[in-house]
Design a protein with these regions (language model features):
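PLD/PLD-like phosphodiesterase catalytic module centered on the HKD motif
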Residues: 1, 86-89, 96-240
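PLD-like (HKD) phosphodiesterase/transphosphatidyltransferase domain
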Residues: 39-125
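Extended, H/D-rich, highly charged conserved domains that either
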Residues: 1-43
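Repeat-unit-sized solenoid/scaffold elements
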Residues: 25-61, 125-127, 191-209, 218
Length: 240
């Protein structure tokens, strides 16, 4: 795993003029390597992590994925597959309730099929962009209210699934602390650790990484359950 990450950094990032050192002076300006920066973006859209040459004989499997852009995005495909192949339960952690359209369609489909869906999202006051009323207003400060509106609309339209227990939406809040968790757990056997926010920006614009843990024997499930309970201590369940 570490060798794959190091090889990717050395091959795709450090070798590029568009990734200058910032511990030397004078610092390069973007205009100095604008063409190289565009080429780097093109290269990263088709880049991927190397895989182990030897077949893994352990029960626990780990794979690395990279994603950038809407087309041919490996990480997005993995995320979509985790949603679509869930047979029993899907657990999601995201700081922003603003799913891209393909994932929202998959969520609704899972609920119609009677699958269990749990979503843990931060309260608007735990959002990175939240500005308390005492601070000057800015456009970026409106985002938490937008996400809150999208969340309440979703809860309202899916109320019957909330009432029958198939959908659990939890709002996290702990004093003035912020919430920036992200991750996916499918059927208690597949877990995605990622910086992907499950929002349109991460889906189509940002470069994102993900580590997919495949654990058919549920060897790490106890630790994941313990972590989930710690998180839910600061949550309230939305009822619509």
């Amino acid at each position: 795993l570490c060798n794959s990450i190091i090889a990717f950094i050395e091959t795709n990032l450090l070798s590029s003029i568009a990734v200058p050192r910032i511990d030397t002076r004078p610092l390069k300006r973007l205009n100095d390597f604008k063409l190289e920066q565009k080429q780097l973006m093109r290269d990263l859209k088709v880049a991927s992590y190397s895989v182990a040459e030897q077949q893994n004989k352990q029960a626990l499997g780990i794979r690395l994925f990279l994603g950038l852009g809407r087309r041919n995005n490996e990480l997005n495909r993995v995320i979509k597959a985790l949603f679509d192949t869930t047979e029993q339960e899907l657990v999601l952690y995201t700081p922003y309730f603003n799913f891209p359209a393909p994932l929202m369609r998959s969520l609704r489909r899972l609920l119609k099929q009677g699958k269990q869906v749990t979503i843990v999202v931060g309260d608007k006051t735990a959002n990175d962009f939240y500005l308390p009323p005492s601070e000057p207003f800015s456009k970026i400060g409106a985002l938490p209210y937008l996400y809150e509106t999208i969340l309440h609309k979703f809860v309202k339209t899916q109320k019957r699934h909330i009432d029958n227990g198939n959908l659990n939406v939890y709002l996290w809040k702990d004093e003035s602390n912020s919430f920036h968790l992200k991750g996916i757990c499918s059927d208690r056997t597949k877990h995605l650790l990622s910086g992907h926010n499950l929002n349109p920006r991460a889906w189509g614009l940002d470069i994102e990484n993900g580590i997919l843990i495949e654990d058919p024997e549920q060897t790490i499930m106890q630790a994941i359950d313990n972590e989930k309970q710690e998180i839910l201590q600061h949550c309230r369940r939305l009822t619509g």
